[in-house]
């Protein structure tokens, strides 16, 4: 029996590998394992809660330097005194807002996710880009197409 979904997942894993995007490669391979085992019963939960869990893990990793003391509080306070840091804060606020629009768009139009993934992988492979978050890319798409 020919499974086109499995073929697509394998192609995405291959693109991730070729483009040195280990996050895509590992993610797709994990999804293949889930798909081909009894763990597939977890797909509804992953589809519903996956982005939230991922954002929580990402937030933990971003805040870890503050919690560990690697980023001293004095550095945080100085961020409000330097114009470059203030620009970084403004960009951070904008990107967070954009990511929120991306989450909404990906939830309302899941077909866009494949395009974002392929675009990210191609950008990494062909233009030596770095795999930026698909949430931000989805946010930009939402601004361009006027959705969410």
Curated annotation (Swiss-Prot):
Pfam families: DUF441
Primary subcellular site in the record, as a coarse category: membrane
Localization annotation: Cell membrane
Alphabetical list of InterPro entries matching this protein: UPF0756_TM (IPR007382)
Organism domain of life: Bacteria
Keywords attached to this entry: Cell membrane, Membrane, Transmembrane, Transmembrane helix
GO cellular component: plasma membrane
Membrane topology recorded in Swiss-Prot or TrEMBL: Multi-pass membrane protein
Transmembrane segments: 4-24, 51-71, 86-106, 112-132
Family: Belongs to the UPF0756 family.
Name this polypeptide is given: UPF0756 membrane protein ESA_02180
Species of origin: Cronobacter sakazakii (strain ATCC BAA-894) (Enterobacter sakazakii)
């Amino acid at each position: 029996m020919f499974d086109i979904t499995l073929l697509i997942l394998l192609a995405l894993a291959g693109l991730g590998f070729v483009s040195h995007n280990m996050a895509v490669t590992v993610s797709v391979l994990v999804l293949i394992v889930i798909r081909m085992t009894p763990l597939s019963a977890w797909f509804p939960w992953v589809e519903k809660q996956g982005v939230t869990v991922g954002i929580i893990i990402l937030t933990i990793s971003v805040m870890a330097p503050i919690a560990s003391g690697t980023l001293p509080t004095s550095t945080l306070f100085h961020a409000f005194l330097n114009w470059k840091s203030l620009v970084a804060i403004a960009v951070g606020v904008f990107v967070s807002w954009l990511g929120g629009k991306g989450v909404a768009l990906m939830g309302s139009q899941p077909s866009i996710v494949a395009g974002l993934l392929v675009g990210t992988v191609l950008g990494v492979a062909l233009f030596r880009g770095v795999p930026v978050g698909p949430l931000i890319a989805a946010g930009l798409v939402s601004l361009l197409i006027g959705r969410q």
